[in-house]
Amino acid sequence: EFISYELHKKLCDELSEVNYKGLIIYSGFVEPMLDKKIYKLVNYAKIKLPNSRVEMISNGDVLNEKRLKKLYDSGLDRLQISLYDGVDQHYKFTELGKKMNLTNEKYVLRARYLPEEQNFGITLSNRGGMLENAEYKISPMKKKLEKKCFYPSYKFFLDYNGDVLMCSHDWGKKNILGNLKKEKFLDIWLCQKSEEARNKLNNSDRSLNPCNVCDVTGDLIGRKHH
């Protein structure tokens, strides 16, 4: 399922009330380009929050020149394509970017595959410990990391049903801070549960679930790491 237009509008409207100027990323547990209203969502976000950067992370499976143009015409500032299929896929999207005269600022290819001699297919984190039984097995941490994590201090994840998750790596949806359908976003962001989680993680305490089995390096902040 995908987020409703009404819920998306509610978030954008509430962010506008606090003059939000940060980053908005369309990504998540499903491919955002499969949502038929994605262009409408991007356009509303850019109109309502003109000083924000609107980005998307896609696997590229349904992308073509026509859809790329429509995304940028809708207001998308930057597209990141996660490549899992190897160098041929990388070449395909490199040529597409050249054909459309897209700059590195607007169009980024992220190689998620390993070198051919290793040939395991992709590189991943363990997504909050959820990949233990996945095809590309990356086990949960046997001993929790004693390392700071700043992710919940500067980002959050809104699920299609309104749940606000503390972290986008929480694929098991184990740490839900609130629900935007029932509450205002700022109340969720500043709630006691949110503050307690940030205080723990900012002090290298990963005792929270699923942080206690997560292998994500949470002190890497910036475009290369979100």
Predicted regions and their residues:
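Conserved glycine-rich "GG(E/T)P / GGGxP" loop and the immediately following alpha-helix
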Residues: E1-S139, K144-K147
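Canonical Radical SAM [4Fe-4S] cluster-binding loop centered on the CxxxCxxC motif
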Residues: E1-Y5, M166-K173
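Generic structural signal for small/hydrophobic residues in well-ordered secondary structure
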Residues: S4, E31, L79-I81, G162-M166, ...
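Secretory pathway export signals and precursors
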Residues: L145, D163, S207-P210
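Short, small/polar residue-rich loop motifs at catalytic or cofactor-binding pockets
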Residues: F150-P152
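Short, acidic, Ser/Thr-enriched surface-loop or helix-capping motifs
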Residues: L158-D159
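Flexible mid-to-C-terminal extensions adjoining Fe-S/redox cofactors in radical SAM and related proteins
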Residues: H169-H226
